Amino acid sequence: MTPDEARENTITYGILRSHDVDGSKGKKMRIRFDAMMSHDITYVGIIQTARASGLEEFPLPYAMTNCHNSLCAVGGTINEDDHVFGLSAAKKYGGIYVPANQAVIHQYAREMMVKCGNMILGSDSHTRYGSLGNMGVGEGGGELVKQLLKNTWDINAPEVVLVWLEGKPKKGVGPHDVAISLVKATFESGVVKNKVLEFAGPGVKELPIDFRNGIDIMTTETTCLSSIWITDEEVKHHYDIHERPQDFKELKPGDVAYYDMMIRIDLSSQEAMIALPFHPSNAVTIHELQADPVGILTRIEEDAKKRFGDKVDVHLVDKVVDGKVYADQGIIAGCSGGTYDNLAEAGAILKGKSIGNDYFTASAYPQSTPVSMAVTREGITADLIEAGVVMKPAFCGPCFGAGDVPSNNGLSIRHTTRNFPNREGSKPGQGQLSLVALMDARSIAATAANGGVITAATDVEYENTHKPYVYDEKIYKCRVYNGYGRPRPETELRYGPNIKDWPTMYAMQENMLLELAAVIHDPVTTTDELIPSGETSSYRSNPLKLSEFALSRRVPEYVGLSKEIQKQDLARRAGEVSANIAEALAKVGAKAEDTSFGSCVFANRPGDGSAREQAASCQKVLGGDANVCYEYATKRYRSNCINWGIVPFTIAKDVEFNFEPGDKLFVPGIREAILAGKEEIDAQIIARDGVKPIHLFFQNLTADERQILADGCLMNYYKNKK
């Protein structure tokens, strides 16, 4: 048996092949999903794009949750206007609508949408349900539009990584500890990028479902493509208590299965972890931090000063008092943190204790109303409230900057998914900087019980005597609208004044003249830097208004530069060629009528983090035509660029890119090259000190993706097909 044949015996390939419409078992896959998920930052844009492309009804179960800006009082009525639009769309097209604060997106999927052997596509990067036997994939809105129009998700057949679990976690160790260690071991090297993680081994049976879910949801931070786990009696129990026993089936690899690599995790030796600013991979054990707090926090301070310069004043080392590190805030929330088991453990640790009445504060967000009901009935809520923890509804806010923003220079410890720069909501342009460290709920509770002194839960005594989770679906039956299979086309969509159509986007011309509007040399550029989240996301349904925030926390000049470039291009299209364009084209011998003029972003490795398509669409709305980088951090960001007509150029790793905003890039014959199937092209940099050659790559584009780029964006592509 060859490796390729044996790879077909993995759980991963069993699921992927059953969803591949080609059925050829080749190196390319064209996937149709079983269901889809979106939240209120993304579903309006997806539906607007799909409507413009010919949508008639939802052809698969599509659940829309309202868990992101539901507590964010920004812009008057605009948040609830989007929610009302979502319900009207669910009625019109046959969707599933989950009202505000009923559940965070991924918990609703776990409770109501997953099935063993199925695949779910979500417009959120943390779409991961592998621990329940359901492969989840997070992509930008364009990929969901394709599914709504009965098209496919096209990928190269991925490599598969075996994650072998052994041993049993010690008391006080939680899922975030294991997950942070996994991210630390894999992110920087990119060793599992765009691969599927398949979890197996004797350690799996030692982990309850909430523990598995907590690890699984964080696999996104490794930059893997998706995940899947073996299923067992614990998974069967999950489906049984959720009244869906028919959706369980045993998943395991064949007798001989080939994996491209293996990661071995000894759960017994896992320590309590802390992921320091500004990435989940920037991790040490809590004991290591306790041993050298000044040295470690000094390095974080230096990193912050390098990132933000004199825009902010950082004093992280001030958190060390008498050799102990003091946090200002503790948060347990979202799809990773707000589980029943995490809250039960936190409640047990804090029972009879107090978080104190000093600067330290704590909040907990059960991840769904059924979980909230369960922790209330079991007395966990009472234990937490009596200790001083504020209980809040199901809401993703602390995970992306729309809830519990810390004070300036505040150190927040969080059981959430990310701690990227400013993701918690601080605004460096206004001199603000908060710092977030990721920890497991157990150690956050131990820290809270110790007055904010960062403490490992493995170092405290406690007994968790709470009963196992009991699920109650009554609330969903009362509140969730499920119209799948029953569209009501006569329903009028309800538009608030902030919900706007997409502006005109132009087809690619024969040549492309680009002006650099942002040049970023950070090792990684996150989607939160490309378009901030938090309160900014309230403007998600107004493309022009949202684009005003593009790169605002990283390159404040970007929007102004891009608008000026776009203004000149619109004038060129009307026959008025600016001196800026004319001078540049004269140096390369090109004509203005054949050459578009657009903005361009250079970054070393852009696109880590969120699947939000706005990271690309905002560039396009501002006249962006291309990105240039050494590599894209994630497939989903690159796909977002393509779907919005932004050419995803790369350059060779040994090429220095020492150019500045205002320098230009001329790409002759780009339209012909893309449509002819070429993968590289010679271009020219028009810099302040002369014209220089540069070689650009645009590899691994499908025929459809090439046409999307030529047409200018996905919407134009579908319009042209009608």
Where does each model-flagged region fall?
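Fe-S-dependent hydro-lyases/dehydratases of central metabolism
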Residues: 1-722
